[in-house]
A protein has these predicted regions:
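Charged, alpha-helix-forming regions
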Residues: 1-251
């Protein structure tokens, strides 16, 4: 991919590839985990995952400058200089929780830190190295994985949109949808877990407004999908969402 590299504390680190048309590929078990990253932290992690390419046997350390990160995120560099410590702290302090299932039921979550290194240095930029414990979820994926171009999530303005977009993608089995689209059923509890909303917005109406509606609006605005949804109810309680998904190309 023609990348430069630098020596940092005796370790070779590679420059970020900045071509956002490249794919972010993750095992569905990683997509379906509990995640609590804020918006820019989530985007930086996905940019780091995009660096993993077919044939990689290891997760490599990377460097990205403040200016390049600002360009990726579409914000002024001054904002990144102001926020970079919060972003790196967020990534380090909020691991992903991988769902372990038995007979279709979640029995526990396994906590895995995203990174072994994520720090800013004024002379080199941001050094980031994904955790080797994530290798089964990022390297040599043959089946049960989700992929999308980085540019699709970089333009999103809500981390809930990123997470629900990934959940929908993980359940779509073909690149081209049938003419009438498809319907995807997701339990409300699973959406809450994936969006770090188990305890936020306890009233469903508030959760719908703040999370589901915001996500669906963003997905419809910036992706190839047209999404609406209906409910699965048990008595008066909404226990699941049926996402109705079709192709919608933006001209």
């Amino acid at each position: 991919m023609g990348r430069g590299h630098k020596q940092i504390e005796g370790q070779i680190s590679f420059d970020f590839c900045l071509d956002t048309r490249n794919y972010v590929c993750q095992a569905n078990t990683l997509v379906g985990g509990k995640q609590a990253l804020k918006l820019n932290s989530a985007k930086l992690i996905r940019a780091a995952i995009m660096q993993v390419v077919k044939g990689d046997e290891e997760l490599k350390p990377y460097i990205i400058s403040i200016r390049d990160l600002a360009e990726l995120l579409g914000v002024p560099a001054s904002n990144i200089y102001r926020d970079i410590e919060n972003i790196t702290d967020d990534i380090i302090s909020n691991p992903v929780y991988i769902r372990e299932e038995r007979a279709g039921k979640t029995i526990r979550f396994i906590k895995i830190p995203w990174v072994t290194r994520c720090e800013y240095s004024s002379d080199i930029g941001i050094a980031i190295e994904l955790n080797d414990k994530l290798k089964p979820f990022l390297l040599n994926l043959k089946e049960h994985y989700t992929q999308y171009t980085l540019q699709e999530v970089l333009v999103m303005k809500s981390v809930y949109a990123i997470r629900i977009f990934e959940m929908i993608q993980s359940k779509i089995m073909s690149k081209i949808l049938p003419k009438d689209g498809i319907s995807i059923e997701v339990p409300v509890q699973e959406i809450r877990e994936c969006c770090d909303c188990e305890d936020k917005y306890p009233a469903f109406g508030n959760f719908k407004d703040k999370v589901i509606d915001k996500a669906v609006s963003e997905i419809n605005r910036v992706t190839m999908y047209s999404v609406n949804y209906s409910y699965i109810k048990e008595k008066r309680n909404v226990i699941g969402i049926i996402f109705h998904v079709n192709m919608c190309y933006h001209g």
